[in-house]
Amino acid sequence: MAATIKKGALVRVVTGNLENSLEALASDRRLPSYMFNSTAEVLDVKDDYALIKFYVPTPSVWLKLEQLEPV
């Protein structure tokens, strides 16, 4: 699955893979609902991470590829 995620792809965040992950534990535990209820665009891919942009006025965020699924 991770191999199919490339720059410009539309993705969704996989709730089960993000909750209780190292990335989620390192930030505010109250994750915003738009992360799980909307799609995001992949801006860049480096190693096991993708920089994604949601279509709401928020900063882009790096997430592991295993926490994303193609739309």
From Swiss-Prot:
Membrane among keywords: yes
CC per GO annotation: plasma membrane-derived thylakoid membrane
Pfam families in the record: NdhO
Main location: membrane
Keywords attached to this entry: Membrane, NAD, NADP, Plastoquinone, Quinone, Thylakoid, Translocase, Transport
Record carries keyword NADP: yes
GO-annotated molecular function: oxidoreductase activity, acting on NAD(P)H, quinone or similar compound as acceptor; quinone binding
Domain of life: Bacteria
Enzyme nomenclature, EC number: 7.1.1.-
Membrane topology: Peripheral membrane protein
Enzyme class: translocase
Protein family: Belongs to the complex I NdhO subunit family.
Its job: NDH-1 shuttles electrons from an unknown electron donor, via FMN and iron-sulfur (Fe-S) centers, to quinones in the respiratory and/or the photosynthetic chain. The immediate electron acceptor for the enzyme in this species is believed to be plastoquinone. Couples the redox reaction to proton translocation, and thus conserves the redox energy in a proton gradient. Cyanobacterial NDH-1 also plays a role in inorganic carbon-concentration.
Protein name: NAD(P)H-quinone oxidoreductase subunit O
